[in-house]
Amino acid sequence: MPRRSDLHRILVIGSGPIVIGQAAEFDYSGTQAIKALREEGYEVILVNSNPATIMTDPEFADRTYVEPVTPEFVEKVIAKERPDAVLPTMGGQTALNVALALHDSGVLAKYGCELIGANARAIRVAEDRKLFGEAMEKIGLRCPTGRTVTSLEEALSAVEETGFPAIIRPSFTLGGTGGGIAYNREEFETIVRRGLDLSPVHSVLIERSLLGWKEYELEVMRDCADNVVIVCSIENLDPMGVHTGDSITVAPAMTLTDREYQVMRDAAVAIIREIGVDAGGCNIQFAVNPTNGELIVIEMNPRVSRSSALASKATGFPIARIGAKLAVGYTLDEVPNDITKTTPASFEPVLDYVIVKCPRFAFEKFVSSDPGLTTQMKSVGESMAIGRTFKEAFQKALRALETGRSGWTIAERLQDDRLTEGSKEELRGALRRPTPERIFQLKRAMLLGMDTKELYEITAIDPWFLDQLRELIDAEQWYEKLTGVDAVSMRRMKRLGFSDRQLGALRGQSESDARAERWALGVRPSYKMIDTCAGEFPSSTPYLYGNYDEESEAATEGRKKVVILGSGPNRIGQGVEFDYCCVRAVLALREQGYETIMVNSNPETVSTDFDISDKLYFEPLSLEDVLEIVHREQPEGVIVQLGGQTPLKLTRPLEAAGVKILGTSPDAIDAAEDRRRFEAIARELGIEQPANGTATSVDEAVTIAQRIGFPVLVRPSYVLGGRAMEIVHDEVSLRDYFERAARVSEERPVLVDRFLEDAFEADVDALSDGTDVVIGAVMEHIESAGIHSGDSACILPPYLIPAAAVAQMKEHTIAFAKRLGVVGLINVQYAYKDGQVYVIEVNPRASRTAPFVSKAIGVSLPSVAARLMLGETLAEVGFTQEIIPPYISVKEAVFPFNKFREFDPVLGPEMRSTGEVMGIDDDFGAAFMKSQLAADNALPREGTVFFTVSDGDKPTAASLAGKFHSIGFSIMATSGTAAFFREQGIPVTSVLKVHEGRPHGVDKILNGEVQLLVNTPLGKHAQVDDEKLRQAAIANRLPYTTTLTAASAAFEAIAARRTREPVVRSLQEWHEILRAPGAVESATAGSTQPAGVA
């Protein structure tokens, strides 16, 4: 069938911020879908609140609305733009839930809008556990024994049928949020209550546990003519009980018999037909009983998913792109395969290689949280690797995680493998409970002589995988004993995925010595193409992976080449913002005629899409892998400053190996990162810093702290995301910090800074061509000093820091850029206190604010930076003047505290946010309100504000309580705070602290008597009370703030919401305002200063 001609305007709903369970894969999917629809001549409208995405850049969709992805705001966009259709399948669970809400409330019918890609019935039947179970029964397939319930009483009745352990799965949530495995009644009641609360329809499925069954996924596509293709099979290495996002996964499935696969395939085809997904793709999860092959259907996602992004990268079959074409009426045989250009999408992909995906976790950021892996997803990112065998791909995927392991290696310290003594008995206990370290504990168990049969009985990991892992140990032991290494034995080990570092360690060599030996033997990787057809048809897209076969399929062209190093797996501190920067650089350099070569290992991202760069190497970002690619490609140079800390760490070793680093020199990067060199430069430029010192021992740190005065900020050098950073108030706490968090030595110094309490902080992004410098933006942090810049909301342009101080920050930034010889991007962080500007740190690289600034000012900073690195000047690029918008942009952070309930959700100097959102409006209050709605922190319009604050905060809190009272809110406070408020004449209700008796503050929150919590940490003695309040707020989805500056901003937002409707404009319209004559000049003159919020 030809494309539908009755549709002209299509609204794509994005997924909003990066959260656990819904990450960069939806930027990738959405970007593909938008490109596919515009190719067909449709006008595309996008709603997405995440500024760090490529899809929200204004040139992708015709109209881009950076607005909250909520029914209310999507309705406003529909009312304004009047699209003919809504495509909800590219924005994860968020988009599906919003689309269904708009359908059910009659909004879509009112505006004559239809759902395409998946209709309302298909979404409802697939997502509603009860309806899905009934649909499976109708086609003769089994789901786990269980019952859908809407109350705790019903749940307790259901669990009598299923028994323990029981699985709890909430309906309509993402990443298993709110679900879990209960082994007893107490756990069961806790998880059910949470699941009912977090499910938008307040229903959960209670099902019989299938722990120990094997878990599989199929990616399936269907068109309007009822053609169905299976794109990819995926097998979870971990058995049922671990969320698929937290499991190591393998494609294609390895341990299914041919008959089992055919049964599963037939089931998948029957399922997609019965559910009614008739123009797009879906992901179907199955469990297989390892003893008799019995098949059970777990669930289906009627949309693109994390697994479909993985399947797309694994096969080269672009599921989202093809799904968008199917949604507008094409059939599979009418859509060409973009990789081969000669075969249609109705040809199922065939793999002649193996893919392994490994999840990346962030438990080090949430130390008190439970590292056990269950049905609720906890990983924050993932790596993918491609090899000729499972063993090769597995080791490469572990290396690509960038957690310090060079392959399947056990840690030097037992505690790093989550063990204390490493005995067989301890290992047996540890292996029964899935954690991120279990895969390494398995190696320890094998080295202690535990056999496959015993390990299978303990872990339920299929014996095939256990035997594959054992063969890696056998190979290590064989290699260790060789008297000499020749090319044959070296190639054998490389084909098993062993890195140079691993091979060196086995024979007492350094990594560089092992590499030199390998090169001397003439053993170097070849590169093969991913072509969707196992080499049956020629591939036109260079999408490559390294291996140690003799034959290479990578052709090298004669054009000038640039290698861009990506950022690897997403993690807290290094997220999709850096992928955005890499993609913008690639696109800018392609426009300038360069051959762009992307190196990355993250299957979720736009940068690893087959058509973004001229050539994609899907390889780990290790020195070994990058050196081999540079050796083969011989580029003009390598760009390291856009991918965060991952490529920056490679700067010095690459330079030492003779590789040209483009842009800012490695020496300048080192001068900014090395505290002693940086201090000397700041002194030379006459720029103030907080008093500080560098310690190489605990005693030295204590001496420095006593000299400069407590409180101090302590942190290791060369970290991203504030890793192991803390504010310390006394010597005892300082010594405790070194015991817990930081190993200190000459090679690993720790920085000790005087902490500037109650200072304002600001970020400045700028561009330099080596001679001239232009400010990109100055952003003021809403949270006060001491909270990591990545976790603080920020506003552009600044609103409380005096104009003279802002001007001084700009001057300092220009001075640093010139002194360091920056070519490309630079980010500088400042503090302002008592009339003095202090520099905190200088980063001569892309910062995580670059995408936000690019959206706010209408200029892509990374695109300009890439051209500067290749020798153009700011004047030649056309960016010669700072742009200060006449509107307000707010960036807000989004946190995963709902996944880590045991962790105290208080903000500090260590970054914990997973993503960000943006709010844009004409004034601060409305922009901040939008940012809170987008971050799922909806502020109340009325009700009770509960204050519990430290003594030093009481005067400011009283002023704020008075403001809330003046607009009709009731005020509640703990005794000390309440007494102070009464002295100021503020009506207030007293409430007990947790240790004072019942009913206390937590009871009030749990009973729904509080609509906003303002809680500033009260010091050690009240820590337990504080923590319980904040955890209750998280559990009850109650908006809360832990700083008074954020509470002031919340007041402004609530007041704005009560006085006017928010402005809904597309990004293109906001940028038109910038281009209006005199707009930027008037802004520069200070006309955009919003009302103060403190």
From Swiss-Prot:
GO terms for cellular component: cytoplasm. The lineage of its organism: Bacteria, Pseudomonadati, Gemmatimonadota, Gemmatimonadia, Gemmatimonadales. GO terms for molecular function: ATP binding; carbamoyl-phosphate synthase (ammonia) activity; carbamoyl-phosphate synthase (glutamine-hydrolyzing) activity; metal ion binding. This is Carbamoyl phosphate synthase large chain. PANTHER family: CARBAMOYL-PHOSPHATE SYNTHASE [AMMONIA], MITOCHONDRIAL (PTHR11405:SF53), CARBAMOYLTRANSFERASE FAMILY MEMBER (PTHR11405). Disulfide bonds: none annotated. Mg(2+) 2 binds at E299, N301. Residues 553-936 are annotated as: Carbamoyl phosphate synthetic domain. Mg(2+) 1 binds at Q285, E299. Large subunit of the glutamine-dependent carbamoyl phosphate synthetase (CPSase). CPSase catalyzes the formation of carbamoyl phosphate from the ammonia moiety of glutamine, carbonate, and phosphate donated by ATP, constituting the first step of 2 biosynthetic pathways, one leading to arginine and/or urea and the other to pyrimidine nucleotides. Its cofactor is Mg(2+); Mn(2+). The large subunit is composed of 2 ATP-grasp domains that are involved in binding the 2 ATP molecules needed for carbamoyl phosphate synthesis. The N-terminal ATP-grasp domain (referred to as the carboxyphosphate synthetic component) catalyzes the ATP-dependent phosphorylation of hydrogencarbonate to carboxyphosphate and the subsequent nucleophilic attack by ammonia to form a carbamate intermediate. Mn(2+) 2 binds at E299, N301. The gene is carB. Transmembrane segments: none annotated.
